[in-house]
Design a protein with these regions (language model features):
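Glycine-rich phosphate-binding loops of nucleotide-dependent enzymes
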Residues: 1-240
Length: 240
């Protein structure tokens, strides 16, 4: 996988099964965020291939993700402070517009608006946040904004959900909430996550890909990867 003529990732083959949670882990600078950004359409990929349900696709731009059944959250959360929680979630259903997200999602009327609101409420229920639908997002504590951001990603009913550091900045109790949310979401979609909290990774992931220096050095089920000497060496800074 190349960017700007430079090879950023080498020999990375990632596969994802239905209703599976796959974690991308590795030390700082390993390449996991680069891979996540490529999947999220945040960088221009010059080489490499993408296949969904056996069909090849060009590497997507952000506005093309929903059309491929992909949705994502990012570390920065990015809620609109002037909107209510429900309105923020409705904005996540952006199938056509490249810009004007708010006007395209909130300018609906009649049946279309009712259907979108219902999907948004369902998404909030899945992250245990339906009770705050009418609150302004700028009134929320940080852990709750993380859940609302996930709900916004769910409103388009994705088949693949990309989560960037879902437990980042959370305390122990909120991490338990997040673990529960992710496990429940996997019953309806497949999930790829980047996460530094290893207790989260061990709790929710079915399989792991461990990256170091832009390459996958280990992959497989959690316990198998956990005991791999190459993984231990990477995290301890030991050269094999």
């Amino acid at each position: 996988m190349s960017f700007g003529g430079l090879k950023a990732l080498s020999n990375v083959n990632l596969d994802l099964n239905a209703n599976e949670v796959v974690g991308l882990i590795g030390p700082n600078g390993a390449g996991k965020t680069t891979l996540f950004n490529a999947l999220s359409g945040l960088v221009d990929v010059e080489s490499g291939s993408l296949s969904i349900n056996g069909k090849s696709h060009k590497w997507p731009k952000p506005h093309q993700l929903v059309g491929l059944g992909i949705s994502r959250t990012l570390q920065g959360v990015g809620l609109f402070p002037e909107l209510t929680v429900l309105e923020n979630v409705m904005v996540g259903d952006n199938k056509n517009a490249r810009s004007g997200l708010i006007s395209s999602a909130l300018g609906l009327s009649g049946k279309d608006e009712a259907k979108l609101k219902q999907r948004a409420m369902t998404a909030l229920e899945r992250v245990y946040a339906s009770g705050i639908a009418d609150q302004r997002s700028d009134s929320l504590p940080y852990p709750v904004t993380k859940r609302v951001a996930i709900a916004r990603a769910l409103v388009s009913e994705p088949k693949i959900l990309l989560l960037d550091e879902p437990a980042g900045g959370l305390g122990a109790q909120d991490i338990e909430w997040m673990n529960s949310i992710i496990r429940n979401l996997a019953s309806q979609c497949s999930i790829i996550l980047v996460e530094h909290h290893m207790d989260v990774v061990m709790s929710v992931c079915d399989r792991l890909y461990v990256l170091n220096f832009g390459e996958v050095i280990a992959s497989g089920e959690v316990e198998t990867v956990r005991q791999d000497p190459a993984v231990v060496a990477a995290y301890l800074g030991v050269n094999n």
